[in-house]
């Protein structure tokens, strides 16, 4: 710690910070542009000038840039010095000489860091009357608008895109005061994290194109704290709504998970919430048509159907909340509840839960991952399955430069010096995969092989680290040497990290990862293991229904029994199983009841569809891959805008159905009631209630506001329908109001922050006001509750070492996961569809020659009653005997995993 004096007041600060960080952490306002908490200092903008004095007696002082000045003990500075204030005002004026002053038509207006800093410095009149520099804008793809004339040359964009995110197709061109930030030519930005430019840029150069199509100011949107639904990482988000539509998603700071950044799938994949074909009223099947019926009529028909069936079973979902899955299990009974994922994935998820519970090795948060000094990724393409992890791994490998900087006593915020000192030295990142990955540019070594051979390498590494681990006796000399190199790199680390997951559907890979983590822990290292699930609530479903059976068991029961009724919640069975098998099973049912918020293939076969609420229209709890229970809150009430909309939370439909069926009062009327019931009945979920406050929370006696206090048009937005002002929607399930009435701001500590705003800070930089220190954690504590923590337990060594992969006449299907299109919900979003690459079938050239197939030609194949025609791509990296398919895309079910195809043939276009 260090003692500094600011405008005559004494403060204790972290001596490792620069003065700008220190002042912002103290809650003092110092304007800045080029600095960012995640990017460090380069001193490019000169905006953060303060007056520094030699001692308490110095009255003259000198101007220094606070972002480039360390917080040494005994530092005396002044923010309010007149010379410093005038200098900062002049800097803004210089920045604005070429700015178009187009705030009224700029999409950044009202959430603009440049506006905030201009007001903060007091610059309020223009003196420049000459020709302004102009630029030609670029088309950067479906996600981001480009307006270069607003640029102030702060260099944040290229520092984030190239230095932080590892992108290569955005740069800066030109010299002196005529520089251009963009691509060499028009084209879609290639980075999976390009959307963060929208928040990194302090002006309106890079803006959200998906928001442009239905634009409104930040102060006119309704927000709620929420959780990304598009993978198992559980990033915190702030969705914004207007007129009953989700308009955009902003990052919600979480000190342990996503920090300041999201992946593009999470930021832009929300379009499925607004689709016009969503079921919004109960739908009754009448021949080939679906007829809208009333809520009471739907519940009575559903209850009659279940009452008259010979048995009722339920199929849950890893994309549904804990509460909805729990309500379904309570309706049908634990023995009749099935988890709704295929057997291979369910076995992997159960094993992953077992390892996290009893393995004795901690599971890292994303922030913890960034501190790892050696990383092994076994068979999991994290860029495609959990992209935000890939961004953290990029920061982790740069830790070598930070280590060198510490040895040389260079402050870590001096990023240019740290980069120069590092000279591209990195901590080792080791990856086993089927083919190339997006992390190959920072990898130390890699293995391209079938999953069985990848697992064998993992088991061999564990044995080399600890001879007590099972040995691989028939490993080839080349792989034995590679295992030795990798074991040495991991064994020499202090904080090694092992990553695996269920996307490969390989138990052997997960068990090999566990063995390696145990061996590293046994050597006294701070080892950690991250096991990546496939969907937002995969781990939560495993914790809730650890003894339940997979989808295949449900289909087998339907095939074996007559007269069953099936209730599914937020699950499209056709995505997870062969079409002919699902068709046959559904045809045998006496009644099919589907509760979902999307018009899926399963819903089209339903006798009755009950319209579920999407994540923006409901409350719920998810458990992310590290075992952190996190609550997402309802953003808006659809029925407020249109009384004909009858969507309900999945658990509310099920509670009402059970009450109708049993002729009893509802078991749960509020979210708090069902959450308490879930926590009480499942020991693993006993502490899930600590993930968020209950509906009774008040701050200074007030509920919390979902809308900024400047929200406009509330009394007139529906005047075209009725001149009488409707009462705002009421929320019995959370402490939030559907209005601007209530508490909003940063003065009182609260972990559930709907939107970032503080007096004078309207941009995402306002998160500084909510943190214990800039870039640290929220003052009230990061949201969520870890349900799984490492114990002193130690699992036995896993010994089921697979045999080497051998080619056969038929080709084994492996998944070529896709970030855009591979996840069910975001793949329905039009903007994500515009970003999806063409689905292809991938073969090794030798296999292509064996089937007489040529690259670029169409390949036809059949499986499970479906027929596909996909263009062929050849890859020498993919091992012989394998065929790569983008499962989940183009109707390719995930059950194709590790199936065998022998009928590949050339298709005539």
From Swiss-Prot:
Gene3D superfamilies: 3.10.20.740, 3.30.200.210, 3.40.50.740
Any one GO molecular function term: 4 iron, 4 sulfur cluster binding
Keywords: 2Fe-2S, 4Fe-4S, Iron, Iron-sulfur, Metal-binding, NAD, Quinone, Translocase, Ubiquinone
Domain of life according to the entry: Bacteria
Subunit relationships: Composed of 13 different subunits. Subunits NuoCD, E, F, and G constitute the peripheral sector of the complex.
Biological function: NDH-1 shuttles electrons from NADH, via FMN and iron-sulfur (Fe-S) centers, to quinones in the respiratory chain. The immediate electron acceptor for the enzyme in this species is believed to be ubiquinone. Couples the redox reaction to proton translocation (for every two electrons transferred, four hydrogen ions are translocated across the cytoplasmic membrane), and thus conserves the redox energy in a proton gradient.
Name assigned to this protein: NADH-quinone oxidoreductase subunit G
Protein species of origin: Shewanella oneidensis (strain ATCC 700550 / JCM 31522 / CIP 106686 / LMG 19005 / NCIMB 14063 / MR-1)
Taxonomic path: Bacteria, Pseudomonadati, Pseudomonadota, Gammaproteobacteria, Alteromonadales
Gene: nuoG
């Amino acid at each position: 710690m260090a003692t500094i004096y600011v405008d005559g007041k004494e403060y204790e600060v972290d001596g490792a910070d620069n003065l700008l960080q220190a002042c912002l952490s103290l809650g003092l306002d110092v304007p800045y542009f080029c600095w960012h908490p995640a990017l460090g200092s380069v001193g490019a903008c000169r905006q953060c000038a303060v007056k520094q004095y030699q001692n308490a007696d110095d009255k003259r002082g000198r101007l220094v840039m606070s972002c480039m000045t360390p917080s040494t003990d005994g530092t005396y500075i002044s923010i309010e010095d007149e010379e410093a204030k005038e200098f900062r005002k002049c800097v803004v004026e210089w920045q604005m000489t070429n700015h178009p002053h187009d705030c009224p038509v700029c999409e950044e207006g009202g959430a603009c860091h440049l506006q905030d800093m201009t007001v903060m410095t007091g610059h309020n009149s223009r003196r420049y009357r000459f020709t302004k520099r102009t630029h030609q804008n670029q088309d950067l793809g479906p996600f981001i608008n480009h307006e270069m004339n607003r640029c102030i040359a702060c260099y944040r964009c290229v520092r984030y895109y190239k230095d932080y995110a590892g992108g290569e197709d955005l740069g800066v061109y030109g010299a002196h005061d005529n520089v251009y930030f963009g691509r060499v030519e028009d084209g879609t930005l290639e980075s999976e994290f390009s959307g963060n430019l929208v928040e990194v840029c302090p002006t309106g150069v890079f803006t959200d194109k998906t928001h442009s199509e239905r634009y409104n100011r930040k102060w006119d949107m309704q927000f709620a704290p929420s959780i990304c639904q598009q993978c198992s990482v559980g990033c915190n988000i702030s969705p914004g709504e207007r007129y009953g539509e989700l308009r955009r998603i902003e990052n919600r700071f979480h000190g342990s998970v996503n920090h300041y950044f999201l992946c593009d799938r999470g930021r832009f994949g929300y379009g499925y919430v607004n689709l016009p074909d969503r079921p919004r009223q109960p739908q009754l099947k009448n021949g080939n048509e679906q007829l809208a019926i009333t809520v009471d009529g739907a519940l009575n028909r559903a209850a009659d159907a279940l009452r008259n069936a010979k048995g009722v079973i339920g199929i849950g979902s890893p994309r549904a909340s804990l509460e909805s899955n729990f309500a379904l299990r309570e309706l049908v009974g634990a023995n009749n509840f099935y988890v709704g994922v295929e057997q291979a994935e369910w076995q992997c998820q159960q094993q992953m839960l077992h390892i996290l519970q009893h393995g004795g090795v901690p599971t890292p948060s994303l922030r913890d991952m960034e501190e790892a000094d050696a990383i092994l990724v076994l068979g999991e393409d994290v860029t495609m399955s959990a992209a935000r992890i890939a961004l953290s791994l990029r920061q982790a490998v740069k830790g070598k430069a930070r280590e060198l900087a510490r040895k040389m006593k260079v402050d870590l915020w001096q990023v240019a010096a740290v980069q120069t000192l590092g000279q591209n030295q990195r901590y080792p990142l080791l990856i086993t995969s089927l083919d190339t990955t997006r992390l190959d540019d920072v990898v130390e070594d890699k293995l391209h092989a079938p999953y069985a051979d990848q697992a064998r390498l993992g088991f061999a590494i564990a044995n080399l680290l600890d001879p007590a681990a099972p040995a691989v006796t028939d490993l080839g000399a080349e792989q034995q040497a590679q295992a030795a190199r990798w074991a040495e790199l991991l064994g020499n680390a202090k904080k090694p990290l092992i990553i695996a997951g269920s996307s490969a559907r390989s138990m052997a890979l997960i068990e090999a990862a566990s063995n390696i983590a145990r061996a590293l822990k046994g050597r006294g290292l701070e080892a950690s293991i991250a096991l990546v699930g496939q969907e937002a609530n995969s781990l939560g479903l495993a914790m809730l229904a650890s003894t339940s059976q997979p989808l295949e068991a449900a289909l087998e029961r339907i095939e074996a029994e007559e007269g069953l009724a099936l209730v599914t919640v937020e699950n499209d069975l056709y995505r997870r199983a062969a079409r002919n098998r699902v068709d046959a099973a559904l045809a045998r049912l006496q009644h099919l009841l589907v509760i979902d918020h999307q018009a899926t293939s399963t819903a089209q076969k339903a006798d009755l569809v009950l319209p579920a609420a999407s994540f923006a229209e409901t409350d719920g709890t998810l458990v992310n891959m590290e075992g952190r229970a996190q609550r997402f809150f309802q953003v808006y009430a659809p029925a407020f805008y249109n009384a004909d909309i009858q969507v309900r939370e999945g658990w509310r439909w099920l509670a009402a159905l059970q009450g109708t069926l049993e002729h009893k009062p509802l078991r749960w009327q509020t979210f708090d009631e069902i959450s308490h019931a879930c926590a009480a009945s499942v020991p693993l979920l006993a502490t899930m209630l600590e993930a968020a406050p209950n509906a009774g929370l008040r701050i200074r006696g007030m509920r919390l506001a979902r809308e900024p206090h400047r929200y406009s048009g509330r009394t007139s937005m529906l005047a075209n329908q009725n001149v009488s002002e409707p009462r705002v929607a009421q929320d019995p399930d959370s402490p939030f109001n559907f209005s601007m009435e209530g508490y909003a701001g940063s003065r009182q500590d609260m972990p559930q922050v709907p939107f970032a705003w503080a007096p004078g800070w309207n941009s995402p930089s306002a998160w500084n006001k909510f943190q214990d220190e800039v870039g640290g954690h929220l003052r009230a504590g990061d949201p969520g509750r870890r349900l799984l923590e490492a114990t002193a337990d130690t699992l036995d060594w896993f010994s089921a070492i697979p045999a080497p992969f051998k080619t056969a006449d038929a080709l084994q299907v492996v998944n070529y996961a896709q970030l855009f299109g591979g996840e069910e919900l975001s793949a329905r979003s039009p903007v994500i569809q515009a970003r999806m690459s063409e689905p292809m079938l991938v073969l090794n050239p030798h296999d292509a020659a064996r089937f007489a197939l040529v690259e670029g030609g169409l390949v036809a194949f059949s499986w499970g009653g479906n027929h596909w025609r996909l263009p062929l791509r050849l890859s020498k990296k993919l091992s012989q005997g394998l065929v790569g398919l983008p499962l989940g895309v183009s109707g390719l079910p995930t059950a194709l995993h590790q199936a065998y195809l022998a009928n590949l043939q050339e298709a005539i276009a």
